[in-house]
């Protein structure tokens, strides 16, 4: 009888522990949504700044002169594909398949790293041609907006590498699930922001 009571108490303790993890995870994700709202304000401010400065060429080049749309299209494809592969990683996580999570995260990381490599190349090329952020208001707004997005993607890649290490070492724990959910929100958010950047900065700049 006493063993049954002890078993019931232990089961109740485990159930309460799981509920605590669930509630804590929900609060963490909610808090991360609030952070993303502040990031929305940041990018909205940068878009507004770019819109104001987009016609200030100061005798320098316009977007039509310097943007290579085919190059940026490939860059965009990398980021869009990384968003899809991250979705596959999340599906594997819900299935509890550690190897699948790590595999898809690795693919996502490679796509994200390819995106950043192309962005660094673009910035280096523009600066080498004398079209750095100090050249005109238009270029200042461009470098501020695109550069800030690039820094966010870099932070996401670092976060992703940390998650790969933690999941490889500790498995798919409740904490890892919560952190992956937050990272998923962050990564998809950056994808949406980049679509806006591609449309407003590059596409409209070339047309």
Swiss-Prot record:
Q: Name one GO molecular function term.
A: cytochrome bo3 ubiquinol oxidase activity
One Pfam family recorded for the sequence: COX3
Query: What Gene Ontology terms for biological process does this UniProt record contain?
Result: aerobic electron transport chain
Q: Which residues lie on this side of the membrane: Periplasmic?
A: 48-70, 121-141, 207
Name the membrane topology term: Multi-pass membrane protein
Name the keywords, alphabetized.
Cell inner membrane, Cell membrane, Electron transport, Membrane, Oxidoreductase, Transmembrane, Transmembrane helix, Transport
Q: Where in the cell is it found?
A: Cell inner membrane
Q: Which Gene3D superfamilies match?
A: Cytochrome c oxidase, subunit III, four-helix bundle (1.20.120.80)
Q: What is its main location?
A: membrane
Q: Known PANTHER family for this protein?
A: CYTOCHROME BO(3) UBIQUINOL OXIDASE SUBUNIT 3, CYTOCHROME C OXIDASE SUBUNIT III
Record family assignment: Belongs to the cytochrome c oxidase subunit 3 family.
Q: What does this protein do?
A: Cytochrome bo(3) ubiquinol terminal oxidase is the component of the aerobic respiratory chain of E.coli that predominates when cells are grown at high aeration. Has proton pump activity across the membrane in addition to electron transfer, pumping 2 protons/electron.
Subunit structure of this entry? Heterooctamer of two A chains, two B chains, two C chains and two D chains.
Q: What is this protein called?
A: Cytochrome bo(3) ubiquinol oxidase subunit 3
């Amino acid at each position: 009888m006493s063993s049954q009571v002890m078993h019931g108490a232990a089961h109740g303790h485990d159930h309460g522990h799981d509920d605590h993890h669930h509630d804590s995870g929900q609060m963490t994700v909610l808090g991360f949504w609030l952070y993303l709202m502040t990031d929305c304000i940041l990018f909205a401010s940068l878009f507004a700044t770019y819109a104001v400065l987009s016609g200030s060429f100061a005798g320098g080049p316009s977007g039509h002169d310097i943007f290579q749309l085919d190059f940026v299209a490939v860059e965009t494809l990398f980021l869009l594909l990384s968003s899809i592969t991250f979705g596959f990683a999340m599906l594997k996580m819900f299935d509890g398949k550690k190897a699948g999570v790590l595999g898809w995260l690795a693919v996502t990381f490679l796509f994200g790293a390819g995106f950043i490599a192309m962005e660094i190349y673009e910035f280096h090329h523009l600066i080498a041609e004398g079209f750095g952020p100090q050249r005109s208001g238009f270029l200042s707004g461009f470098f501020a907006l695109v550069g800030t997005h690039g820094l966010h993607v870099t932070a996401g890649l670092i976060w992703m590498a940390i998650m790969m290490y933690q999941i490889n070492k500790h498995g798919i724990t409740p904490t890892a699930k919560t952190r992956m959910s937050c990272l998923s929100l962050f990564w998809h958010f950056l994808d949406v922001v980049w679509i806006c950047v591609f449309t407003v900065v590059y596409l409209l700049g070339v047309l």
